[in-house]
């Protein structure tokens, strides 16, 4: 996600942000990180060049938002929006640059040269924007993220590291991070290889693993002791029973297929009722892992002004 301002002659890049969720999930439902943590500097430079060329070619006067996809070192342009985006307040606070105010003045004739604009990538901290999802108010709604936006708000976390910033954003969104207990894992076949390293890191942090049959088999074969539990409808006690009995601390569930989505709905509803954090993508699981790691250090509260002055 890129926010920029153009006066028709020059372009200022407000920030380049990396979504934690993959392309295909609505940007409003995805957490995002500033500065990006998994994009090469050469690719970021390519993104800057594309943004400037598009803004000038489209004769944009004011704000422009562009969404890119990044895969295997290649950059793909998804959409170009010649308008302000929902990330403008986040970027402005993270970089201490009043983008909306500057864009308003540019729109009525001001030049970007009149403003002392600093490069966005010189900020000495990490900022994370997290979506606030209303599933506790709508318990029958599917928690599976998709191109359809479901979030009703956003929060922001700032710190010196990604894990700490994401931890703060999670707390702001009302998601309490576990520090011990059992992690339930049930992932689709496409995610099984990617979950192994994440599961191993949870074990190193002291968590125990529990999973559905296929996922548990994969983890056990890779040297990770994993308890097997029934899916919904297979027998009792099943995973929903385990959640209701407060035996699960965190749920990682990436369903695929009609039966898996049925299970996901029952699992999601139970997690919401019992205040258990659930993540539905591998990338989100990795981010939560970083956040949990950072809980070993004391959280120091600072004002936004202290980060910039």
Please provide the spans of the model-predicted regions.
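Short glycine-rich anion-binding loops that position phosphate/pyrophosphate groups of nucleotides
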Residues: 83, 188-190, 255-259
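Glycine-rich phosphate/diphosphate-binding loops that line cofactor/substrate pockets in enzymes
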Residues: 171-183, 202-203, 242-248
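ATP-dependent carboxylate activation and anion-phosphoryl transfer catalytic cores
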Residues: 1-179
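Phosphate-binding active sites in nucleotide-utilizing proteins
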Residues: 12, 194-200, 214-220
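Peripheral docking tails and interdomain loops at the edges
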Residues: 230-231, 239-309
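Short internal beta-strands
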Residues: 184, 206-218
């Amino acid at each position: 996600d890129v926010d920029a301002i153009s006066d028709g002659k020059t372009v200022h890049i407000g920030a380049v942000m990396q979504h934690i969720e993959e392309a295909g999930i609505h940007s409003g439902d995805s957490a995002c990180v500033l500065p990006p943590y998994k994009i090469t500097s050469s690719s970021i430079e390519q993104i800057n060049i594309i943004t400037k060329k598009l803004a000038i070619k489209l004769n944009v006067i004011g704000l422009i938002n562009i969404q890119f996809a990044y895969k295997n070192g290649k950059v793909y342009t998804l959409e170009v929006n010649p308008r302000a985006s929902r990330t403008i307040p986040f970027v402005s606070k993270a970089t201490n640059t009043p983008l909306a105010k500057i864009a308003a003045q540019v729109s009525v004739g001001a030049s970007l040269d009149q403003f002392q604009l600093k490069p966005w990538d010189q900020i000495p901290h990490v900022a994370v924007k997290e979506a606030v999802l209303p599933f506790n108010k709508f318990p029958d709604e599917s928690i599976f993220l998709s191109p359809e936006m479901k979030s009703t708000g956003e929060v922001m976390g700032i710190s010196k590291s990604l894990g700490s910033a994401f931890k703060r954003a999670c707390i702001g969104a009302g998601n309490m991070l576990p520090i011990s207990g059992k992690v339930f894992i049930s992932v689709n076949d496409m995610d099984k290889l990617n979950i192994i390293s994440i599961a191993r890191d949870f074990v190193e942090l002291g968590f125990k693993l529990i999973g559905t049959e296929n996922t548990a088999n994969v983890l056990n074969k890779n040297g990770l002791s994993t308890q097997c539990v029934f899916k919904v409808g297979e027998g009792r006690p099943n995973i929903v029973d385990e959640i209701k009995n407060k035996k699960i601390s965190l749920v990682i569930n990436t369903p695929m297929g009609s039966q898996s989505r049925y299970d996901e709905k029952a699992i999601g509803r139970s997690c919401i009722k019992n205040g258990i954090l659930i993540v539905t993508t591998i990338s989100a699981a990795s981010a939560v892992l970083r956040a949990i790691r950072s809980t070993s250090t004391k959280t120091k509260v600072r004002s936004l002004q202290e980060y910039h002055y």
